[in-house]
Every structure is written in structure tokens, then in C-alpha cells.
Amino acid sequence: MYNIEVNVISTGSTGNAIFLDGQVLVDCGVPFSKLAESGVVDRVKYIYLTHQHRDHINVATLKKILTNRPTVRIIYPQYLVNFFADCFSYDCSFLIQKSFISSITKWYKIGNITFSCVPLHHDVPNVAWKIHFSTPQGIYKVIYATDTASMDGVIAKDYNLYLIEANYDKEDMVQRIKEKRMTGQYIYEDRVLKTHLSKQKADDFIYENIGRNGAYMYLHGHEDKKDNE
């Protein structure tokens, strides 16, 4: 189905990590052991990061990867620089040496990959990654976008693979909020509506952009939380 390897190691609030083309890890929000079990640690060359939430960046995992694989490059937007400086205030030199800091909307080339990031709409700065792989069959275009209230301003015409958040069904979510308000429960879903993408919006984006040979995968499905969480 795909011209490149696509391995969804984990997606959702418990952790996000997707391995592409046997070399690219997009987000690193899972334990090191999970990546090791998936065979990623020995193969990964580049790690693309989106935003600071811990289900997308597991700092301990990232540090262990860099310790075990010193040639790995970490690619992330400028706004994560301060986040990493805070995390590794005692010593972030090991990260700086392996960092590739990407400016929003600017295109770069590294190895057989051309890539760019575009802003999304979350409660912290966040981006979607557009990653183009040069393969023997031609250019294979992937867009990865999660944790966003909308896809406004994002265009990805005729991409080969759309990895897009479809966190909830809007009608179901609105009904759930109404029921919780009536019973006085904590409404976690209020935040979800403002920070995550509905299946309806995901479908709209995909259908507006996908071509004849495109494929898509839904990511980051909503998980109901208990009132005390």
C-alpha cells in the first residue's frame, strides 16, 4: 500500500511515535524500551519533533537514544530551544551538537529527505511536518499533523500519505459535554474541542487535498478520562 515503510509505534495521549522509511522517527513520546522493541533504535537517523507535551517528547527516551546513537539528528522548530534548555539546564551540549533547528515554512534537505514545518493551532506552539522522501519510484510525500484545533492555513495537495489527527466525532463530543454538565462532572472534553481535531475536520482536510493515489491514516483518537484525572 505504501512505497515507504510506515510503522505506527504509538499514537494518542499515552504516547506518540511513528517510524517512516526505516530512518525517520516523528515524535518521541514513548519509553525507550518501546522503540527498542520496535527495532527503531538501531535504525533511526532523524527524529522530527512537533511540540513540548510529554506524550510527544519523552525527554528520558530522547537522551538515551542520543547516548546510544550519537549520529542521530534531532530536528525541531526554534520554539523548542528554550524548552530543551530548561530540561537540560545542567548540560544540554549533547543535544545542541545533534540539533537541526528548522524555521517555520522554510524547506530543507538532508539525505534523501526534503522537509518543512507549518504552524498548527494548539495550546502550545506546534507544527505539522511535511516530509518528502526521494525513492526509486519517485518523490513520496507525507504530512503528519496532530494536536490541532483546525488545519486552517495548511495545504498539502496530492500527497501520498496523510497522517492526520481524528481525535473525536463532533456530535458525540458535544453530547458528552452536555451530559457531564447536567451531572456536574469535570468536563475534560471542553479542552479537547479547543485543542484537537475532529474526524469531520480531518476528513474535510483530506478530501480537499488528497489525489488519486493518496492514502491516509487517522491518528490520536480520543480516550475518555476519569473525573479525577
Predicted regions span which residues?
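Conserved beta-strand hairpin/beta-sheet module of binuclear metal-dependent hydrolase folds
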Residues: M1-G39, V127-D147, L161
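Active-site metal-binding loops of divalent metal-dependent hydrolases
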Residues: S10-T11, Q23, C28-V30, Q52, ...
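Divalent metal-coordination and catalytic microenvironments
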Residues: L20, D27, H51, I74, ...
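Structural motif
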Residues: V24, K45-Y48, I113, Y140-V142, ...
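Active-site metal-binding motif and surrounding structural segment of the metallo-beta-lactamase
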Residues: F32-Y79
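Metal-dependent catalytic neighborhoods of phosphoester/phosphodiester hydrolases
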Residues: N58-N68, F83-F88, K226-E229
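Metallo-beta-lactamase
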Residues: P77-I139
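Cap/insert and terminal regions of metallo-dependent hydrolase folds
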Residues: I155-E229
